[in-house]
């Protein structure tokens, strides 16, 4: 293992997408998924919900390490209804049917523990999906992609063909808003871009 491969951050998530996004900005991580209760509180606003879960994941994930620890959570929101991961086929089809032809919000919370204590923020991105036909929704479910995705779709996967427009952070919809994440990591002393040779 080279020094640039040595983890500088603990990621309190099993999401391969979040790990890949962090790798894209040169941050090597060790993965320690945090298993927490993700039930929304009564009348909890979506932004407060995802930020609370991100903070709790970072707190749980930080146990037993001196590394800064990142927690994150994403929710798809229609009105004030929070859509998490679908429970089953029927739930996924109901979610995709509700999102069909709408502009909805994808709200992502991030939190990082470290020398500066617990730092957190959230990002709201507006996504417009075209009208989806019932046979498309069924075929998409059969692809297996919706199973572990908030709102039952993955913007970086097969569902990319459903997306008419994005207003905000594309990486946040994938799983981690890189601009805001980089700011929090820098404040906690985490180096970005790994150890890259200087440009002559």
Curated annotation (Swiss-Prot):
Required cofactor names: a divalent metal cation
Site label Important for substrate specificity, positions: 17, 74, 156
A Pfam family the protein falls into: Maf
Stored SUPFAM superfamilies: ITPase-like (SSF52972)
EC number: 3.6.1.9
Enzyme class, spelled out: hydrolase
Keyword Ribonucleoprotein in annotation: no
An example Gene Ontology molecular-function term: dTTP diphosphatase activity
GO biological-process terms attached to the record: nucleotide metabolic process
Top-level taxon in the UniProt lineage: Bacteria
Catalyses which reaction(s): dTTP + H2O = dTMP + diphosphate + H(+); UTP + H2O = UMP + diphosphate + H(+)
Role played: Nucleoside triphosphate pyrophosphatase that hydrolyzes dTTP and UTP. May have a dual role in cell division arrest and in preventing the incorporation of modified nucleotides into cellular nucleic acids.
Name of this protein: dTTP/UTP pyrophosphatase
Upper lineage: Bacteria, Pseudomonadati, Pseudomonadota, Gammaproteobacteria, Oceanospirillales
């Amino acid at each position: 293992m080279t020094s640039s491969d040595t983890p500088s951050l603990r990621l309190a998530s099993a999401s391969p997408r979040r790990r890949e996004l962090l790798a894209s900005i040169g941050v090597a991580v060790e993965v320690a998924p945090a298993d927490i209760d993700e039930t929304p509180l009564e009348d909890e606003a979506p932004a407060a919900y995802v930020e609370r879960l991100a903070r709790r994941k970072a707190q749980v994930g930080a146990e037993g390490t001196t590394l800064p620890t990142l927690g994150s959570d994403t929710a798809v929101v229609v009105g004030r209804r929070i859509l998490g991961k679908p429970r089953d086929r029927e739930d996924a089809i109901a979610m995709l049917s509700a999102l069909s032809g709408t502009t909805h919000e994808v709200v992502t919370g991030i939190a990082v523990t470290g020398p500066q204590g617990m730092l957190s923020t959230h990002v709201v991105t507006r996504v417009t999906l075209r009208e989806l036909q019932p046979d498309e929704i069924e075929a998409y479910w059969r692809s297996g992609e919706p199973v572990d995705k908030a709102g039952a779709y993955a913007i970086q996967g097969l569902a990319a063909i459903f997306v008419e427009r994005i207003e905000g952070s594309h990486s946040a919809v994938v799983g981690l808003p890189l601009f805001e994440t980089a700011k929090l990591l820098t404040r906690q002393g985490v180096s970005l871009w790994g150890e890259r040779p200087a440009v002559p």
